[in-house]
């Protein structure tokens, strides 16, 4: 069940429950011969819409939030998504994005998780901007160990210099 509600002309709330991504095309099979995880592109419509809002710095340069982790266990098994919500748009001159998703314990012993992302971004004159992001994953339910969480805090900015130049940077901390 999916619901979309326009709170204002520039702010939208999307809610999903008992999410089924069966209509999404299957990923190409890849063989991994090193210790680094394979990164598949996101194909689920709920996560693709307004995805650029949840990036820090230049898109593709650094990915503090990778939505493909939602609904997939550590060994690649499917973890059912109980539901979630996304608030995105403009609010008082700020671009805002809030995403909240909850998974359930599946057929395997993967604990349920709560995923949350909050992003604010302010566009300024002369191609300048600044913003902040918070990403959280918290293990929930009886299978979750105490202290089972990952948190990331980040800030980014871009300052237009003259007609063609720009200075861009970002800072992030994880725990």
Task: Label every model-predicted segment.
Residues 21-89, 95-100:
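Residues that cap or anchor secondary-structure elements
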């Amino acid at each position: 069940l999916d619901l979309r509600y326009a709170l204002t002309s520039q702010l939208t709330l999307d809610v999903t429950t008992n999410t089924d991504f069966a209509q999404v095309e299957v990923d190409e099979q890849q063989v991994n011969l090193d210790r680094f995880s394979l990164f598949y592109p996101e194909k689920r419509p709920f996560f693709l819409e307004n995805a650029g809002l949840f990036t820090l710095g230049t898109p593709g340069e650094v990915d503090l939030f990778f939505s493909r982790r939602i609904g997939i266990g550590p060994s690649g098994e499917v973890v059912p998504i109980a539901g979630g919500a996304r608030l995105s748009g403009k609010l008082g001159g700020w671009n805002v994005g809030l995403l909240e998703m909850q998974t359930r314990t599946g057929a395997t012993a993967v604990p349920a998780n709560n995923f949350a992302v909050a992003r604010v971004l302010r566009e300024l004159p002369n191609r300048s901007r600044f913003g902040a992001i918070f990403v959280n994953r918290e293990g929930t339910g009886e299978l979750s160990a105490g202290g089972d969480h990952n948190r990331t805090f980040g800030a980014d900015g871009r300052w237009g210099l003259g007609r063609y130049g720009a200075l861009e940077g970002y800072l992030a901390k994880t725990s």
